[in-house]
Amino acid sequence: MPNDQTPILTAACVGLLLFASSSFAESPMNVDDAGTLGQGGMKIEGTWRKEGQARGAEFVFGFSPLENLEVGISVARDRDHADSPATRFSAVGAGLKWVPIQNDTGWSFGTTLDFGRTRVTDDATPSRHIEHEIAINGLATWRAEAGHTVHLNLGATRLKTSGQSDTVGTWGAGYEHPLAENLKLTAEIFGEKHSRPDKAIGLRYEVIKGVKISGAIGRGNHRSFGQLGLAWEF
C-alpha cells in the first residue's frame, strides 16, 4: 500500500472505534458478550471517551425485535487535537447481533455484523473524505454460577476510503468479576493483526434496575484511553 494512504487508513481506524466498537459491547468494555436484550427490550446508551488527543461522544440505541436477535444504531462525533485545527470525525453505524445459543451458566455463542460510515474533515488542509467500514465478529461467553464471566471475540474489519481498502483481523478477551451485588470489575485485552494489544480495566455499577454507570481506563500502542458511560435498559 502506498505510504500516502497510511494517514487515511489510520483515520478510518479512529472512526471505526467511535462508530461501532461498543455498539453492542456493554460499557465500559470494548470486548462484546454473547448475549442479547430480551425480546421486546430496548436500551439507550451514551459514552464519552478519550483516546490519545482525540475526544468524542457516542450515542447508541438498541432493541430486540426477535428472540436472540438485537439491532443497534449508533451516532458518534469526535475531534482529534493532534492537529491544529482539530480533525473532525462524524460517524453513523448500524449492526445486527445474533446469539442463537444463550445460557445463564456455561457457554453462549453468537456473532455480530456492523456497518459504518465516517465523514472525516481536516480543516488544516482542508480536505474531506468518506470512509466505509464493515465488521464481522464471532462471540463466545462463559458464565459461572458465582457471577464470573469470560468473553472471547474473533473477527475482521474491512475499511474502504478514497478507492483504497484494507482488511484486518481483530480479537479480544474480557473478564467480569463481581465485587458486590450491583458492582462489577471489568478487565480486557484486545487488538488487531500487526499491532500490539490494548489493555483496559474498569467498573460498572447498577444504580437502579436497568440503569448503569461505568468507567474505564486503558493503555496500548503508545497512547492512553478512557471512557465514561451511562446506560438504560428497559
Language model features with spans:
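N-terminal signal peptide c-region/cleavage motif recognized by signal peptidases
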Residues: 20-22
